[in-house]
Amino acid sequence: MYDKKEDYRKSHMGASKPKEYDPQFWIPGATNHLFWQIERQILLDIMDCLKPRPKRALDFACGTGRVLSFLEGHVPETVGVDISGDMLKLARHRCQRSQIIEGDVTTNPDLLTGKFDLITAFRFFLNAQPELRQNVLAALRRVLADEGILVANFHLNPKSITGSYLRFRHWLKGSNRAMMSLKEAKDLLESSGYKPVEIRGYGYLFHRRKQVRFLRLRGPLEKALAKINPYPEVALNFIVAARLR
């Protein structure tokens, strides 16, 4: 967890960051590996509902190219942008045909050209400071097509079972941990000129460790709950699809 007093832009700088960050999504049995499997299906579901299908997609804060490499298989033209050159080294190796841009969209409005039918932003808004969140959403708004869609992921809901446990644990320690509820996420998007049109929750069970206990039982159950999408307000993670207002 980065120091909240620092600018979040600095949080993924450094040659060691890709090795620290990336493996958790690819190790079978890891909690984030399970969540990434679910996220891929949610992305597919959202894209399948778009008419016409997206022809040009941007993955904002693409990091090591996890989401971007997935989009390559489903969208004709894909672009990734990130401020961390260290993370992008792995993204360039992983992504076969995407245009990958290093830079800050909040300070360089000419960094991105043209409009995008689909923009994804995963694992960014939770830890970014409020001003940076607003500035990023404004920058993305400029390049989102009129009928395009923004798909944003939020990965630590305080109203979930796991979130409630973590809040209590940090309270005992006298510390804080960044969290964002579904209402807070919707308010953030709406205040920046977006209208949420679909919400998908996942991570309904209690997850205390980085590895999923009883994976053969809990893995399929988590996937089934994500498909049913009963109460995204109490899921650990959620994805919000939003259009321009």
How would you describe each model-predicted region?
Residues 1-51, 54-61, 151-173:
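Conserved class I S-adenosyl-L-methionine
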Residues 168-184:
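Acceptor-substrate binding/catalytic loop of class I
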Residues 134-146:
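A short glycine-rich, Lys/Arg-flanked "PGG" loop and its adjoining helix->strand segment in the class I
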Residues 64-107:
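Class I SAM-dependent methyltransferase SAM/SAH-binding core
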Residues 167, 198-245:
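A C-terminal cap/extension of S-adenosyl-L-methionine-dependent methyltransferases
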Residues 120:
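A conserved beta-strand element that flanks and buttresses the S-adenosyl-L-methionine
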